[in-house]
Amino acid sequence: MCTFSMTIKTFLLCLCLTACNGNEEVTEAETSSGYPSLLNKTVPVPAEYLGETASQGSVVQIDYDTRNYVDGNGEMRSNTAYVYLPYGYKESSDECYDVFYFVHGHGETAASFFQNENGMMRNLLDHLIEKGDMSPVIVVSTSYVYGTPVDYYPDADPYCKALPQELVNDLIPLVESRYRTYTQQT
């Protein structure tokens, strides 16, 4: 395993989506709410980033064993995550990568992150990496949904609260053991 290292460049993905301008004035409405409205301070994704690149990363599905952390009974279950691997990723290489973990919104699935909008997120990652706007990175999309996804999850709170346990105990160790990531050796 590689030794632990952080790179701030991978944070550009998040900044690309919010892109605030420090020179803009904050309105009274924004001040009274306690935080600025980022909706008015985002930038559109450049049109050329919506198409595929010559250097495409890949998205792979991984199924993994986990526990039912909602009920706390330790019952085994399985879950699915999707992993974006940047163009040029090789298992046999010594190169290591930072990892981002994303969770879908309400009514979505782990697959939604990479499938919605004709794969726009994968295309965006490919373009950012190809143009040198961010370092190559592994992106993992997981789900708090147990079983078959439905459009309406009436009581998602227990599942959302249980997700960190699943990430820390099951998914992150699997990703770190299967892919070339920066990890801290213990």
Residue ranges and their predicted role:
Residues 4-13:
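Sec-dependent signal peptide recognition
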Residues 21-23:
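Bacterial signal peptide processing site
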Residues 16-19:
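C-terminal motif of bacterial Sec signal peptides marking the signal peptidase cleavage site
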Residues 26-186:
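Non-catalytic cap/lid and distal C-terminal segments of serine-dependent acyl enzymes
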